[in-house]
Amino acid sequence: MPLHQLGDKPLTFPSPNSAMENGLDHTPPSRRASPGTPLSPGSLRSAAHSPLDTSKQPLCQLWAEKHGARGTHEVRYVSAGQSVACGWWAFAPPCLQVLNTPKGILFFLCAAAFLQGMTVNGFINTVITSLERRYDLHSYQSGLIASSYDIAACLCLTFVSYFGGSGHKPRWLGWGVLLMGTGSLVFALPHFTAGRYEVELDAGVRTCPANPGAVCADSTSGLSRYQLVFMLGQFLHGVGATPLYTLGVTYLDENVKSSCSPVYIAIFYTAAILGPAAGYLIGGALLNIYTEMGRRTELTTESPLWVGAWWVGFLGSGAAAFFTAVPILGYPRQLPGSQRYAVMRAAEMHQLKDSSRGEASNPDFGKTIRDLPLSIWLLLKNPTFILLCLAGATEATLITGMSTFSPKFLESQFSLSASEAATLFGYLVVPAGGGGTFLGGFFVNKLRLRGSAVIKFCLFCTVVSLLGILVFSLHCPSVPMAGVTASYGGSLLPEGHLNLTAPCNAACSCQPEHYSPVCGSDGLMYFSLCHAGCPAATETNVDGQKVYRDCSCIPQNLSSGFGHATAGKCTSTCQRKPLLLVFIFVVIFFTFLSSIPALTATLRCVRDPQRSFALGIQWIVVRILGGIPGPIAFGWVIDKACLLWQDQCGQQGSCLVYQNSAMSRYILIMGLLYKVLGVLFFAIACFLYKPLSESSDGLETCLPSQSSAPDSATDSQLQSSV
């Protein structure tokens, strides 16, 4: 493949006035070129045919005729480097060049984003409970493991986005994917170094009478030290994923036409959202396999001591990341024909009021550490960018908070098991989140939204989701639980008067450490078999569930003559379930519908040399103000709705029973607060946005409309590749 050679210095087209003052002929270069010799963007004369030889007419000519010389001050063509061929250093065979297109790099970036979402947001969330059980971790320790990803990203975002933005983006991306794969392998390492998982079954703690010493046995296994290994794996995940959502997005955006960019970015983010869905499905299936594969056990998947094969998914994702990184490392600094799209983006940038924009227009700007303070200062002076960052932080707070605790909300409201609630939430997120993300980019492209119109679209989506949040004013009644919300006789219990001990189970010596709810034949839910007064005798009914007979705390049934209990929670008969699910779907859909338009607006309101750095700064703001505190804030208010806390040998554990009405009320308050802030930030951003040109749509007409047949053919090929 012929390589296009360019000089070390960028070529700047001067304005007509400056050209006249210097005595230069400002006739368009294409008119001075010899007939039949195509002119390559970035050079005055073409010495050879190349993939970049796409036009004989300068891209800025029609723009200058329509808007005057002001537009030409901003047009600079930057050197694309020594080669636009796809390959690894000197090895660039012609057969690889079929992948050297925007669609080719989009495929591999989607694969990387899918793996990142599947591992970090899928596998990690799925196996957290298993890790706590297997390695004796407390909840705050597992929370610190999850937060290590965001901590790593915040530490690396400034460095990666600033220097990677002016560097070789595919190489930054490829090495980042390799780091992600390494992090997955490190995360799975404790399974092979901690020894076998062996447990002893003791049914004495479950039934009446209980064995008091069976639960709080002193354990000094030292397995909790593996927390540091898990944190290291997550830290590598965070470092490796940092280039993906900053440099990856800008690399896609700068190599396609501005009208097609939202679609490409939407496909990229859709893959990132489908990744967690696959992670939940694959991770859930792997947890049904015993962690010590090949060894028989008496444990069942319903047992609180069961640990599934949590580590298999990380081995698979790590290997897949290594295979994905290799082709990404082979892509050039710029794809063939990409420079012609720089002119399209120039007039959509937010207009600055001083001369500092001239320095930012220098193609060498942002390549040294000396430019870092000015880069930050230029972004801080851009009110549209700041407001979009704040709006993104409010949306991130809701997304991270609700994605973390929505399964718990569904579990409490509809009396579901943890696996059922997670599966139901996954069914909501896949079409709502994935569909909203893709359609957001599709609408921006289909409606040809530019500038403030994109921000108005984000404002509309936020208002609709704000109205949908009002559904949390509804709630399902809590299932009555003996000793918590109802007395053992069935009457309502005043709030705050908890008493799990009654005359019917006083002689059972029930332990509060073992929570294993059962549903009595009287419609009440009991803390455990022991608290229901059930002896060890069992039988299996037609549905495969264990039924416990002769329970002393359950009133006798006239038909059967004795009270009995069934393992598991009582089912909910809430009639509002369909309505709640529909409106939760609406909130998720419109929240994700605005994500790609908001990202597009961010890319358009800053200058080309700063776009990667701007995305990095935005991600830092979003994570610090939204991603990290979001789950903490939602967890804090949800804990306020707790009625019964777990007693772990004298220490307070997790919440076991929530008050549904209070949980809905607190989520409603949090949702309204952050959605109102999001509406305000988008509205003010739309009001303050001032593009460099009155009509950014006119940039599309800057492309050559009249050219020779060979150039037209080349232009058609470039557009078809986009």
UniProtKB/Swiss-Prot annotation:
Bilayer topology: Multi-pass membrane protein
Extracellular face residues: 125-143, 196-222, 294-307, 401-420, 472-580, 639-671
GO biological process: monoatomic ion transport; sodium-independent organic anion transport
SUPFAM superfamilies named among the record's database cross-references: Kazal-type serine protease inhibitors (SSF100895), MFS general substrate transporter (SSF103473)
GO annotation, cellular component aspect: basolateral plasma membrane; plasma membrane
Gene3D superfamilies xref list: 3.30.60.30, MFS general substrate transporter like domains
Residues in compartment: Cytoplasmic: 1-103, 165-170, 254-272, 333-378, 445-448, 604-612, 690-722
Record-annotated Kazal-like domain positions: 498-555
Reaction(s) the record says it catalyses: 3,3',5-triiodo-L-thyronine(out) + L-glutamate(in) = 3,3',5-triiodo-L-thyronine(in) + L-glutamate(out); L-thyroxine(out) + L-glutamate(in) = L-thyroxine(in) + L-glutamate(out); estrone 3-sulfate(out) + L-glutamate(in) = estrone 3-sulfate(in) + L-glutamate(out); taurocholate(out) + L-glutamate(in) = taurocholate(in) + L-glutamate(out)
Pfam families: Kazal_2, OATP
Phosphoserine PTM sites in chain numbering: S34, S40, S43, S46, S50
Keywords: Cell membrane, Disulfide bond, Glycoprotein, Ion transport, Membrane, Phosphoprotein, Transmembrane, Transmembrane helix, Transport
Glycosylation (residues): N499, N557
InterPro entries: Kazal_dom, Kazal_dom_sf, MFS_dom, MFS_trans_sf, OATP, SO4A1-like
Region (Disordered): 1-52, 703-722
Tissue: Widely expressed. Expressed in placental trophoblasts. Expressed in pancreas, kidney, skeletal muscle, liver, lung, brain, heart, colon, small intestine, ovary, testis, prostate, thymus and spleen. In testis, primarily localized to Leydig cells.
Domain text: A conserved histidine residue in the third TMD (His-191) may play an essential role in the pH sensitivity of SLCO4A1/OATP4A1-mediated substrate transport.
Protein name: Solute carrier organic anion transporter family member 4A1
Taxon lineage: Eukaryota, Metazoa, Chordata, Craniata, Vertebrata
Gene from which this protein is expressed: SLCO4A1
